[in-house]
Amino acid sequence: MSVEATDPDFKRAIELIDAGDCVALAKMLDAHPRLLVDRVPVADDAAGAYFANPKLIWFVAENPVRNGTLPDNIANVVIAIIEAARKHAVAELKADLDYTLALVASGRVARETGAQEPLIQVLTGA
């Protein structure tokens, strides 16, 4: 499924999530904290209503499937996003984590790659 960000900053942040580049992602979120709160402008609504106007953190779930895989360090990527959200006092962090948790729990890629349990632990422990 194609979920293509139209904003270049969001597109780059999603690429960093997909690459598992925690350091570059943390720097980007520090430089552009709006990425933590804004909805990702996407080219169309091909992903359906449950992923309409997604938040950046939702992309860690790989649900809907975009690449069919997750980086080995995806739990650390989530930690980097959570730390940035706390640093920038993101008011809706709890709601964002809850929705991300639902995407992780219901997604096949996280389950099939062995990332589901570590992601659930990070998301529920935050």
Regions found by a protein language model. Give the residues of each.
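Ankyrin-repeat boundary/"N-cap" motif
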Residues: E4-E15, D38-R66, A89-G114
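Short coil/turn connectors between adjacent alpha-helices in alpha-solenoid helical repeat scaffolds
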Residues: V23, A61-A75, A105-G125
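Ankyrin repeat domain, specifically the short helix-to-loop turn at the C-terminus of the second helix
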Residues: K27-D38, N73-H88, I120-A126
